Swiss-Prot record:
Belongs to the eIF-3 subunit E family. PANTHER family: EUKARYOTIC TRANSLATION INITIATION FACTOR 3 SUBUNIT E (PTHR10317). Residues 222-399 form the PCI domain. One of its GO terms (biological process) is formation of cytoplasmic translation initiation complex. One of its GO terms (molecular function) is translation initiation factor activity. Its main location: cytoplasm. Component of the eukaryotic translation initiation factor 3 (eIF-3) complex, which is composed of 13 subunits: eif3a, eif3b, eif3c, eif3d, eif3e, eif3f, eif3g, eif3h, eif3i, eif3j, eif3k, eif3l and eif3m. It holds the Pfam family EIF3E_C. HAMAP family: eIF3e (MF_03004). Component of the eukaryotic translation initiation factor 3 (eIF-3) complex, which is involved in protein synthesis of a specialized repertoire of mRNAs and, together with other initiation factors, stimulates binding of mRNA and methionyl-tRNAi to the 40S ribosome. The eIF-3 complex specifically targets and initiates translation of a subset of mRNAs involved in cell proliferation. This is Eukaryotic translation initiation factor 3 subunit E-B. GO terms for cellular component: eukaryotic 43S preinitiation complex; eukaryotic 48S preinitiation complex; eukaryotic translation initiation factor 3 complex; eukaryotic translation initiation factor 3 complex, eIF3e; nucleus.
Length: 446
């Protein structure tokens, strides 16, 4: 379903190495011409040192042609450069492999003290850090992400936050952990990078906006694979004003992922309040971005159009199954979306026939009754079934005045943030800069 594919938009904000998994996914889904995807891979690989991979792609794309001499020459050059960097880095790596050095690294949190220890015991010098950084980048360019992550960890421990390569190394470490699918380490790196960006007083507002936009896109890999990711994405994208502002200004298509995280959230009480806030954002941005997922939310919670919501839900299945980040959410999404339709419909009608409900949920009456019984049994629904009449009767959940005051206060606070963001959006014009390509940079992203 190429109509709703966001790969091109998202790739604009990713390092080229992070785009490869997306292209592999599209290749499996067969929604694009395979030759076009292979050409896209080859174009991306031309700026990396993954020459063997590039040769394989070239063979698949042009099975009747010989491998170009330029690729063979590049391979020779890359191997020579790798050997040179290995020889330069070998004494540095041996320092870090020393058991006493490893104990010092585990016990010492201060990079300056550790640097002084290495300088005293191993004659460590400042230029070694630059060598280590270059070697880490080269390993990354070659597709050796585990080596890159290891050397970037050493680099990060030793350099101060003011170092010209400090921020760039954080991006590289995050990318490496993502590509190795080390989600715990990636979440830690994501948090560290976010803190660095948010506490940066040197960058201009535009640079900070660009950095946050990149972080939002890179974080999708982590949030939709880490066990706590769907909670964290809501907190960051919806309730952190600077990041919500970045989404509204630079990348409203991210609302697809925020909406999916909200709909699939397992905390029922939290989900209801979050949905209210999400609906406000979707309404506000509907003129800049919409797809079946955001339209489903709008049909159900703004227009109360259950027939349209049901149609959009069927479209959502096609969107989810063809989205690299969301395909694993499909079952949770459909289950919870049906629950939302059911709850909203019953909240309006209070009493409803099971046969009518089955029609709204695209189920048989027997399936619908079993589904409702399971909801009641699992305490996810306050309702009773009248089997004789074939009706479902909703319970009456009274909300305390205290809770009403809290919700109204939250709503006012949220609306104030939205108003401030709208003013800021009108003052500053968005400027989409090129994506950070960590491996091709020498001095970070600026």
């Amino acid at each position: 379903m190429a109509e709703y594919d966001l790969t091109t938009r998202i790739a604009h904000f990713l390092d080229r190495h992070l785009v490869f998994p997306l292209l592999e996914f599209l290749s499996v889904k067969e929604i694009y011409n395979e030759k076009e995807l292979l050409q896209g891979k080859l174009d991306l690989l031309s700026e990396t040192n993954m020459v063997d991979f590039a040769m394989d792609v070239y063979k698949n794309l042009y099975p009747d042609k010989e491998i170009p001499h330029s690729l063979r020459d590049k391979r020779t050059t890359v191997v020579a450069q790798l050997k040179q960097l290995q020889s330069e880095t070998e004494p540095i790596v041996k320092m870090f492999e020393d058991p006493e050095t490893q104990r010092q690294m585990q016990s010492t949190r201060d990079g300056r003290m550790l640097f002084e220890y290495l300088a005293d015991k191993h004659s460590f010098r400042q230029e070694y850090l630059d060598t280590l950084y270059r070697y880490a980048k080269f390993q990354y360019e070659c597709g050796n992400y585990s080596g890159a992550a290891e050397y970037l960890y050493f680099f990060r421990v030793l350099v101060p936050s003011t170092d010209r390569n400090a921020l760039s190394s954080l991006w590289g470490k995050l990318a490496s952990e993502i590509l190795m699918q080390n989600w715990e380490a990636a979440m830690e790196d994501l948090t560290r990078l976010r803190e660095t960006i948010d506490n940066n007083t040197v960058s201009s507002p535009l640079q900070s906006l660009q950095q946050r936009t990149w972080l939002i896109h890179w974080s999708l890999f982590v949030f939709f694979n880490h066990p706590k990711g769907r909670d964290n994405i809501i907190e960051l994208f919806l309730y952190q004003p600077q990041y919500l502002n970045a989404i509204q200004t630079m990348c409203p298509h991210i609302l697809r992922y925020l909406s999916t995280a909200v709909i699939t959230n397992k905390d029922v009480r939290k989900r209801r309040q979050v949905l209210k806030d999400l609906v406000k954002v979707i309404q506000q941005e509907s003129y800049t971005y919409k797809d079946p997922i955001t339209e489903f939310v709008e049909c159900l919670y703004v227009n109360f159009d259950f027939d349209s919501a049901q149609r959009k839900l069927r479209e959502c299945e096609s969107v989810l199954v063809n989205d690299f980040f969301l395909v694993a959410c499909l079952e949770d999404f459909i289950e919870n979306a049906r629950l939302f339709i059911f709850e909203t419909f019953c909240r309006i009608h209070q009493c409803i026939s099971i046969s009518m409900l089955a029609d709204k949920l695209n189920m048989t009456p027997e399936e619908a009754e079993r589904w409702i019984v399971n909801l009641i049994r699992n305490a996810r629904l306050d309702a009773k079934i009248d089997s004789k009449l074939g009706h479902v009767v909703m319970g009456n959940n009274a909300v305390s005045p205290y809770q009403q005051v809290i919700e109204k206060t939250k709503s006012l606070s949220f609306r104030s943030q939205m108003l401030a963001m709208n003013i800021e959006k009108k003052i500053s014009h968005s400027n989409r800069n090129e994506t950070p390509n960590w491996a091709a940079q020498d001095t970070g992203f600026y």
